[in-house]
């Protein structure tokens, strides 16, 4: 982003804008108070601001769980069936036929009786999400495969009538809301139009008897039909009416949906929320909805620097791109997950972390341990995450994200050091989170008081600082502020693991 040269600190300008977005009442609240009615036009829908609960909550969890959890084959479990039907030479097709027989005799639909979810317990899932420190959570309501995870009137191919024979979305909605978390419903079903080759009569996906699962039969390059678009919108509205989600998350595929259908869906959701006097948010992938109509989502990515706009990223606990459960797939370590949460929040972002449960409804032990580890870290350091806003700069340090612009730039090989620091602020407090143990002393160069001709004064002054402590320790630390920066003596013992928060209390609010 290019900034005009002026007598204003550009970092301060970004942080001020980001802070004002929190302090100004959200447009949902304003709209509800004024009795605003949204029209199905981009002009009417383009005044959305992120709800206060999301700006304060920062961290959420969602799940990819469905029929694709039965074969549990990677690299991407949720695209397994697509590869099986479309690519005869793919590893997925070879695995399918070697394990289950010819595709002509055993198709994707035949996994449904095996998707029994006999150990699924919505209360246990919600309890785990709460212990992990999540402030919002929920399931994928329907993925590209056409199998709905709620009791829908639009198709008999759903979890309430087949497979588990349980209303998974409904059970999770009740369990999550009971724990005062906001409820998330994720939709990926726009890409159902392209997911199966329904024109191919050799396989069950081309059989009209199974079109409720595989989708409307159409020619290879046909545009989405009115019947498909009506069903796409109808399913979302049904979930809104039945389960009242606080966040509706959209995957790629919205570019396939005609503008009028997207406009009608958004207007319905926002008007319903206003009638219910609640704040809601819709997320979207880049270039699929106009700016201002929802919140930008960066898949497995993050911004390189502090942004004036807020954003959310969806990432996953595994080291690849499995999303759903994949047998034998490795997991990230807790350092990586904690560091990524801290980094995103410092840059005006939020994290929606995915877990892929097994077909029986259990969450893998490795994933469970990671979530509980996140919760333990947040118990000590959540003060530097929840309810904070960005500072004038996201941070400092030698480790930089240099790949890509936002989407798919996540790096599992990124290793932060004891000199990598990320900043957040709340009230009179500046939180400097170090992404590895800094040793005996920490030097924060960004806090050196200095004058620059076109930015003015920056940093802090000794007279401004009331005290410095480390979260989890609480004892006042010795410090010295010089032209090199703020030098802080660290505690003798580490109060936690993974990342360490210095709380700098200032006499006046930031």
Task: Please report, for each region that a protein language model flagged, where it lies by residue.
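N-terminal secretory signal peptides that target proteins for export/translocation
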Residues: 1-8
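Intrinsic disorder/low-complexity segments
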Residues: 4, 22-24
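Bacterial N-terminal signal peptides
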Residues: 11-22
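Sec/Tat signal peptide C-region and signal peptidase I cleavage site
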Residues: 25-29
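Mature catalytic domains of secreted/periplasmic carbohydrate-active enzymes
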Residues: 30-510
């Amino acid at each position: 982003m290019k900034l005009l040269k002026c007598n204003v600190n550009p970092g301060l300008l970004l942080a001020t804008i980001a802070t004002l977005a929190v302090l100004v009442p959200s447009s949902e609240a304003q709209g509800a108070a004024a009795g605003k009615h949204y029209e199905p036009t981009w002009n009417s829908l383009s005044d959305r601001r992120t709800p206060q609960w999301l700006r304060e909550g920062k961290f959420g969890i969602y799940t990819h769980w469905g029929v694709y959890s039965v074969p549990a084959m990677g690299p991407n479990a949720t695209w397994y069936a697509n590869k099986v039907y479309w690519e005869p030479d793919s590893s997925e097709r070879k695995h399918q036929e070697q394990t289950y027989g010819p595709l002509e005799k055993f198709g994707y639909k035949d996994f449904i009786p095996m998707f029994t979810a006999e150990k699924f317990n919505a209360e246990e899932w919600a309890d785990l999400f709460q212990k992990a420190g999540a402030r919002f959570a929920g399931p994928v309501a329907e993925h590209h495969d056409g199998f709905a995870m709620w009791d829908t009137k639009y198709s008999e191919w759903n979890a309430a009538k087949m497979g588990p024979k349980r209303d998974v979305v409904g059970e999770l909605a009740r369990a999550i809301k009971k724990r005062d978390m906001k409820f998330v419903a994720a939709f990926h079903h726009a890409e159902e139009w392209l997911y199966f080759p329904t024109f191919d009569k050799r396989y069950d996906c081309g059989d009209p008897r199974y079109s409720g699962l595989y989708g409307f039969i159409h020619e290879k390059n046909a545009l989405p039909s009115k019947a498909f678009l009506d069903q796409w919108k109808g399913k979302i509205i049904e979930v809104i009416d039945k389960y009242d989600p606080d966040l509706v998350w959209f995957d790629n595929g919205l570019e396939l949906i005609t503008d009028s259908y997207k406009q009608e869906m958004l207007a319905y959701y926002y008007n319903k929320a206003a009638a219910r006097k609640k704040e809601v948010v819709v997320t979207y992938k880049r270039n699929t909805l106009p700016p201002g109509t929802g919140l930008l989502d960066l898949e497995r990515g993050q911004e390189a620097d502090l942004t004036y706009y807020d954003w959310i990223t969806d990432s996953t606990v595994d080291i690849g791109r499995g999303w759903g459960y994949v047998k034998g797939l490795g997991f990230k370590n807790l350092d990586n997950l904690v560091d990524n949460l801290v980094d995103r929040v410092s840059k005006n972002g939020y994290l929606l972390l995915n877990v892929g449960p097994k077909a029986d409804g259990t969450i893998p032990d490795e994933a469970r341990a990671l979530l509980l580890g996140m919760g333990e870290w947040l118990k000590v350091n959540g003060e530097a995450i929840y309810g904070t806003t960005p500072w004038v700069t996201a941070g400092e340090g030698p480790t930089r994200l240099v790949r890509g612009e936002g989407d798919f730039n996540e790096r599992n090989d990124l290793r932060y050091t004891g000199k990598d620091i990320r900043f957040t602020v709340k009230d009179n407090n500046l939180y400097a989170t170090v992404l590895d143990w800094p040793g005996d002393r920490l030097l924060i160069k960004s806090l050196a008081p200095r004058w620059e001709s076109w930015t003015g004064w920056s940093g802090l002054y000794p007279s401004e600082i009331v005290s410095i402590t480390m979260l989890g320790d609480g004892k006042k630390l010795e410090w010295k502020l010089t032209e090199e920066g703020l030098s802080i003596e660290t505690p003798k013992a580490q109060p936690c693991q993974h990342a360490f928060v210095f709380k700098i209390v200032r006499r006046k609010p930031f």
